[in-house]
Structures are given as C-alpha cells and as structure tokens.
Swiss-Prot record:
Belongs to the UPF0053 family. Hemolysin C subfamily. Keywords: CBS domain, Cytolysis, Hemolysis, Repeat, Toxin, Virulence. This is Hemolysin C. Residues 81-142, 146-203 form the CBS domain. It comes from Rickettsia typhi (strain ATCC VR-144 / Wilmington). The keyword Repeat applies. GO terms for cellular component: plasma membrane. CDD domains: CBS_pair_CorC_HlyC_assoc. SMART domains: CorC_HlyC. InterPro entries: CBS_dom, CBS_dom_sf, FAD-bd_PCMH-like_sf, FAD-bd_PCMH_sub2, Ion_transp-like_CBS, Transptr-assoc_dom. One of its GO terms (molecular function) is flavin adenine dinucleotide binding.
C-alpha cells in the first residue's frame, strides 16, 4: 500500500508539472506571436483556444493567467498607467554626483525619468546601473549621455499594441501624453507583464499597492491612497462620494478636506463613522492612509482574516 501511495503521488506531481510546462510554453508562444512580423488573428486565438481547452485541468493561478490574457485585448494604456502625480523624475541639469545621492535616498526604482524644464518635456530615462557604472569608472560623463530612449503612447492605445511597440523600439518605458502633448502618466514593461502573470514584487515594493488594502482589525484598514473610493464604499457599506464630487481615489477625498498635502500623522474626519490618518506621504502626494471605522466593519460584507 505504501508503494502504491508513493507511485500515485509521483504520478500526480508529474501530471501537475506537465500542466505547468504546457501553460508556460503556450504563454511563450503567445508572447512570441505578439512580436512576430507575420502574426495572424488565427494564430493568436488558436493559442488561446488550446489554453481554454485545458483550463479544466488548470490550477487557480493558471486560470487567473488565462483570464488575464483574455481580458488583455480590451485593456488600454489608461487602465494601468502610473498617473502624473505619482511620477518620480529628475531634471536634465542635475549633476551626476548629486543625482547618485538623490537616487539612494529618494528614488525607489531602477529606472528614472529625465525631463528638461518641466515634466511635459520628458527626454528619456536613465538606468541606475548606468549611473553607478559612470561614477565607478570616474568617466567625465553627463546625465545627457546616460539617457535611454522612451516611446510615446496615447491613453487609448491597446496594451497589446504597446507591448509590441516596446519590443520593436527596444525600450521598457512609455510616456502617456494627453491631446495637448502634456505628460499624463507612464507605463513600464513590468506593468504590462503584471497584467498577465499578476503582481511582481521586488526589493523596492511596499507591502501595499494601488489595487489592494489590508484589514488590521474590525475597525482599522490600511490602504494605498490611490484606491478608488467606490471600492471602500463597497467594503464598509457606507456612501462617501456624492455624484457631483470630482475625486475618485481616497487620496483625492482627503485633499478635498484640506488645503494641501497633509503631513504624516494628520487625522481627518470624513464622516461620523470614518477617520483617515496619513501614514505615508511626500510633499507632493499621499501614499498610504489608515482608515478608522468607529462603528466597525460589517462582517457579512467582508471576510476578515
């Protein structure tokens, strides 16, 4: 009996591995197809069909990837872009030595935008490894020489088209511009990949991102300031936003109650039941807030863990 059990476990593991290999292989085919010069709709949907046929044997994660792929065709740049208010960028005239110190302290990303004059005139981006290489070799270099090119995308551009364009242009960053040519936001290659495989955490990521929150207890929630107010309303079962209000996010809600970005530790009464405390912010934007509910959460509306 013991030998039979081991054999069954081995067979089960082998089948699971085969499923995973199939999914990964099809994903690679799909991505390769997106970048192919001879791609046809039949090839694209043929791969999707093969994935769907095997969906009954997929794990939850694999099914999520398939669902993301099916939804990707209808998503646009505007759906996933980092808004202008959250963009971290550096002036073209910045000294390299000063820039290295600034990046160590303030910039949590490996790629940083460079602008000339204003953020509406982005000239490219630098990779942190290029900067430190120039400093280590004591090259008489300027910031301008380290700049890598970016591409331009409209908010309405399809994500599949942007992914293909990034590959053709061999760049990892796209600047999103509005109808007047102003900078509206940015999208990175990591943003696109995350739309397919889910969130990718690295050493610079915080615990929370723009799509989630953390319930601390029955009366406390920690949330990213970019979470939409409608989601919070759904969770706490309380109306916060009026039809004529011009904000969409929790951060926007807070800013309508104060004249400027509040300092960390500031507490703001939103209603008789809701108090919001700022727990992370920069001089220009809110990052993270703590939401206190005096009446507590409705346990029937949210699964507390």
């Amino acid at each position: 009996m013991l030998k039979s059990s081991k054999k069954e476990d081995s067979s089960s593991k082998k089948n699971q591995d085969n499923k995973l290999i199939f999914i990964v292989r099809q994903l690679f085919y799909l991505i390769k197809h997106l970048f192919s010069k001879t791609k046809t709709p039949d090839n694209f949907f043929g791969i999707i069909k093969r994935l769907k046929i095997n969906s009954k044997k997929m794990s939850l994660d694999e099914c999520n990837i398939l669902a993301n792929l099916l939804q990707l065709e209808n998503k646009t740049v505007e759906d996933i872009m980092v808004p202008r208010s959250d963009i971290v960028a550096i002036k073209l005239t910045t000294n390299l030595a000063e820039l290295s110190e600034s990046i160590k302290i303030e910039v949590p990303h490996t790629r940083t935008l460079i602008y000339d004059g204003t953020l509406d005139n982005v000239v490219g981006f630098i990779h942190i490894k290029d900067l430190f290489k120039a400093l280590a070799t004591k090259q008489n270099s300027t910031l301008k020489r380290l700049i890598r090119k970016h591409i331009i995308a409209a908010p309405s551009m399809k994500l599949l088209d942007l992914l293909a364009k990034m590959r053709r242009e061999r760049t990892h960053i796209a600047i999103v511009v509005d109808e007047y040519g102003g900078t509206d936001g940015l999208v990175t290659i990591e943003d696109l990949i995350e739309e397919i495989v889910g969130r990718i955490d690295d050493e610079h990521d915080q615990q929370l991102d723009s799509t989630n929150f953390k319930v601390i207890n029955n009366s406390t929630i920690i949330a990213n300031a970019r979470i939409e107010v409608e989601l919070l309303e759904e969770i706490i079962k309380e109306k916060i936003k009026n039809d004529d209000d011009e904000f969409d996010t929790i951060g926007g809600l807070v800013l309508t109650r104060v004249s400027s970005v509040p300092a960390i530790g500031t507490r703001i009464d939103i209603s008789e039941n809701i108090e919001i405390e700022v727990i992370d912010a920069t001089p220009r934007s809110l990052k993270q807030v703590k939401i206190r509910l005096k009446n507590g959460l409705n346990r029937d509306s949210f699964n507390l863990t």
